[in-house]
Amino acid sequence: MFMKSIVEEALARAEREKKERIEGRGFEDVEDEILQVLHELKTVIKVIGVGGGGCNTITRMYEEGIEGAELIALNTDVQHLYYTKANRRILIGKRRTRGLGAGSLPQVGEEAARESEDEIKKLVEGSDMVFVTCGLGGGTGTGAAPVVAEAAQEAGALTIAVVTFPFSAEGAVRRANAEAGLERLREVADTVIVIPNDRLLEVVPNYPMQLAFKVADEILMRAVKGITELITKPALINLDFADVRTVMEKGGVAMIGLGEASGEDKAAESVRKALKSPLLDVDVSGAKAALVNVTGGPDMTIEEAESVIEEIYSKVDPDARIIWGAMIDPELENTMRTLIIVTGVKSPQILGRKGYPVTRKYGIDFVR
């Protein structure tokens, strides 16, 4: 009976606190000093979409809403930029491209970014974490994203690139440009999360390619939102910025797995789906680190969240560093989602059968 009354009191208190948060009460008497310290401790996170693909992803993120992150769109194509939804929109390389785009030439994209380098450096100044997102293979994203990532690194920010790798159907030139762009990003970003578009065809087979691009935007959005809101949003189990930095700093190439399940065995099923996700085209047993976001409805228990992590621990290297957080989403009644980002992986599909392309910083010409 004693334990029952404790549980009932805890549940009642949780309900009161929830109501106070919704009504905006309960903080009037917090001292100014505490508010000031909280403000100073706030992690400054910026998400920068570069080029057409990157700007499309920023629009999707803006529509979804990512708590605690500023969304910024960079492009050489003024018309595309005009229709992009973002907190800030910046036209780069005005003299080089006159707002007409990079013509699918990464060298032009890089030159445009170099022209606007001072503006880019001011953009990332004071940031703790910068996400750089783009579709590799085109002109602006492939050429300019490494310049943005380099500026973020020099500003001292944890720099995470989240990119798509082109469909085989897009042609050999685009894929060769993507490989060169990926190598440059690896040299200037802490971690590069790669979404291989070819694998999306297993997720949405027999659908138009345009839909596959929309799916890619959704996955990129979930990756950034999943990492960011574990830091910025109150959660069942929170992570702080130092936790994320531990796993993502110098993480190398990373891949992402997503799983969702409902019903009695939802915890185990969601993690199984995440680990078997077509996007996670690697042997996770050799991964050196992983970041996991477990999201469930109000009915999710700590035990369910922990069982997800136990399952992941059983699949990876015993010495791998795993950090995880758990969040509640009121819309996920009787459903759980697992997002896993595995760092330090090598994927032949992404980097060629012989391993990493042999390139050096700014020492390779993009294929025209």
Curated annotation (Swiss-Prot):
Its main location: cytoplasm. One of its GO terms (biological process) is FtsZ-dependent cytokinesis. One of its GO terms (cellular component) is cytoplasm. GTP binds at G52, G53, G54, C55, N56, G139, T140, G141, E170, R174, D217. PROSITE patterns: FTSZ_1, FTSZ_2. Keywords: Cell cycle, Cell division, Cytoplasm, GTP-binding, Nucleotide-binding, Septation. SUPFAM superfamilies: Tubulin C-terminal domain-like (SSF55307), Tubulin nucleotide-binding domain-like (SSF52490). It holds the Pfam family Tubulin. GO terms for molecular function: GTP binding; GTPase activity. It is found in: Cytoplasm. Gene3D superfamilies: Tubulin/FtsZ, GTPase domain. Homodimer. Polymerizes to form a dynamic ring structure in a strictly GTP-dependent manner. Interacts directly with several other division proteins. NCBIfam families: ftsZ (TIGR00065). Essential cell division protein that forms a contractile ring structure (Z ring) at the future cell division site. The regulation of the ring assembly controls the timing and the location of cell division. One of the functions of the FtsZ ring is to recruit other cell division proteins to the septum to produce a new cell wall between the dividing cells. Binds GTP and shows GTPase activity. Belongs to the FtsZ family. This is Cell division protein FtsZ 1. It comes from Archaeoglobus fulgidus (strain ATCC 49558 / DSM 4304 / JCM 9628 / NBRC 100126 / VC-16).
